[in-house]
């Protein structure tokens, strides 16, 4: 849990949801203000909630998750923050909304927030060459820190090579450059003009930011992300293997068996070193705080002057991607939504927000065996359902729409399921 000193920013939390933040500074040089959109202080309509709960329960079955935590904030209609399921098959303790968990690739946005903060302070240049700050990567002399943030460095990803080692030796502490080397060893793609999903790029960016600032990555995320938004349960933990907080959601994985996975006996992997993710996917949070961060980041609310625009130059998320699915700034742009999704051992997490209205969806599943697409599809399915919620009395719904339907992503989850729906009891 980050420590809030008297010189850091303080926040007053208004409204029913933790998203309604008004942040004020303590001294002239530290002054900072972020005001979230007004949020209707009531529950979302029952039929909307019922549809969303059915969507989450469906995704839990198909991914082998025993538990989930969800937050949906529709400023003009209401909120839905809930926990479903249990810690594991063996531990039938009910999941609660205050449990903390690993947020996976949402960490990438935090790392980019730090980059832009240091650039705004004149401590680093966005177009600085990577070797200026990271040793042993001389071949990246034409790659900039902004390329690392935007996913345009061309380097590969380490996870496909080392994921098995993470699961077999969760207590191992990895050096970021060692981990990144597995991605650097892959054939690069053309830099600058092509997005490539690369954990190695964000690992290198973390090292560069540490070198530029003289601070650790944990200290940087505390100073530039957690403290400004008063996120007391959000941090990049120390690398020693540990659970993600004092009240953690259990993280699980499924063992591979012939023809698929053993969905009846998830394996606990709650305790692991945060170094497997570091500044790519190592941070932890709670659902309320994840939603708060996602909304503020989408609105570029952590910066006094959002210029240059962090999300101004998106590229297709992959070859032949839909025109509304792009990536830049450590985030994915999905229609009007900005956010991230991904998995890390034990957890699959997604968080997306609309910068104009403040509409926000955040969700975590306590199983990481399915592809990271599953939790993205769930977040988008929930967003499609919630976007149709009627305005509360006295409110006016904005012009807000998504380029997909909830049915589309219900079917997409079905298509990539790693676990079958259990037979109905006779």
Where are these regions (language model features)?
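Structural recognition of the beta-strand scaffold that forms the well-ordered cores
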Residues: 69-71, 102, 147-149, 196, ...
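Short active-site loop at a secondary-structure junction
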Residues: 63-66, 90-148, 189-198, 278
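Secretory targeting and sorting signals
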Residues: 1-31
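A short acidic/small-residue loop/turn micro-motif
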Residues: 86-89, 368-369
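Short, surface-exposed loop or secondary-structure junction motifs
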Residues: 142-337, 341-343
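Catalytic loop of the DD-peptidase/beta-lactamase superfamily, centered on the K-T-G motif
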Residues: 26-80, 268-426
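Solvent-exposed, polar/charged alpha-helical surfaces in well-ordered, non-transmembrane soluble domains
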Residues: 50, 54-58, 93, 112-116, ...
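Primarily hydrophobic membrane-targeting regions of prokaryotic envelope proteins
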Residues: 26, 71-73, 113-120, 200-211
């Amino acid at each position: 849990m980050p420590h809030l000193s008297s010189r850091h920013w303080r926040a007053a939390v208004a409204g029913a949801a933790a998203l309604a933040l008004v942040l004020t500074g303590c001294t002239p040089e530290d002054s900072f203000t972020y005001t979230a959109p007004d949020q209707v202080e009531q529950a979302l309509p029952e039929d909307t909630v019922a549809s969303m709960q059915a969507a989450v329960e469906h995704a839990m079955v198909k991914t082998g998750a025993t538990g989930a935590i969800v937050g949906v904030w529709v400023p003009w209609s209401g909120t839905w923050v809930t926990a479903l399921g249990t810690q594991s098959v063996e531990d039938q303790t009910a999941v609660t909304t205050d449990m903390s968990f690993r947020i996976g690739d949402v960490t990438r946005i935090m790392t980019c927030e730090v980059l832009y903060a240091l650039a705004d302070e004149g401590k680093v240049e966005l177009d600085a060459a990577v070797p200026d700050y990271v040793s042993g990567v001389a071949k990246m002399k034409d790659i900039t820190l902004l390329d690392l943030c935007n996913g345009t460095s061309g380097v590969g990803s380490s996870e496909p090579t080392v994921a098995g080692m993470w699961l077999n030796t969760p207590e191992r502490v990895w050096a970021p450059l060692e981990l990144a080397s597995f991605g650097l060893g892959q054939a690069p793609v053309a830099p600058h003009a092509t997005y490539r999903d690369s954990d190695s790029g964000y690992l290198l960016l973390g090292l560069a930011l540490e070198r530029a600032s003289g601070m650790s990555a944990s200290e940087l995320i505390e100073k530039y992300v957690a403290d400004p938004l008063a996120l007391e349960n959000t941090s990049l933990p120390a690398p020693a293997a540990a659970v993600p907080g004092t009240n953690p959601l259990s993280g699980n994985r499924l063992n591979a068996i012939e023809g698929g996975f053993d969905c009846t006996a998830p394996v606990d992997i709650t305790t692991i070193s945060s170094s497997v993710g570091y500044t790519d996917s190592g941070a932890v949070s709670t659902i309320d705080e994840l939603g708060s961060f996602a909304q503020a980041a989408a609105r570029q609310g952590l910066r006094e002057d959002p210029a240059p625009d962090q999300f101004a130059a998106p590229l297709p998320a992959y070859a032949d991607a839909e025109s509304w699915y792009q990536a830049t700034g450590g985030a994915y742009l999905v229609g009007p939504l900005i956010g991230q999704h991904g998995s890390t051992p034990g957890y699959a997490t997604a968080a997306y927000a609309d910068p104009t209205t403040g509409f926000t969806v955040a969700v975590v599943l306590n199983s990481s065996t399915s592809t990271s697409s599953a939790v993205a599809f769930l977040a988008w399915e929930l967003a499609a359902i919630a976007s149709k919620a009627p305005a509360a009395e006295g409110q006016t719904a904005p012009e807000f729409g998504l380029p997909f339907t909830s049915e589309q992503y219900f079917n997409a989850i079905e298509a990539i399921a790693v676990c079958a729906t259990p037979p109905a009891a006779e």
